[in-house]
Amino acid sequence: MALAFIEHASPNFDVRKSAIDMLVVHYTGMKTATESLARLMDGAIENRVSAHYLIDEDGRIHRLVQEEDRAWHAGVSYWAGVRDINSCSIGIELQNP
C-alpha cells in the first residue's frame, strides 16, 4: 500500500548533517490542522519551526519537509549521547487540539 501525501513546501529546513536513526513524534496543541500548517510553514525568523510530516485528525498526511532535509522540530536537544536530534531524526506532528 502506497501512502498518499499532501505536499507542502515549508521554508524551515536546512542540510541534514547525519543519517536518520530516530523518529520524534510531537503533538501540535493547536485547534486545527490549518493553524498547525500555518505555524509549521511560517518563514518569519522568530517562528521558524517545522516537521517532516503533520498527520491530521482525519488521517491525511501532510509532507512539509523532504526526508533528506533537516526539519526544525526538536530544538536544542540531547538524547542518549546524541546532540542535534534534528539532523538524525524524522519529525512527525500529530494534530491534537
Which ranges hold each PLM region?
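Active-site-adjacent loop/helix surface patches within enzyme catalytic domains
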Residues: 2-97
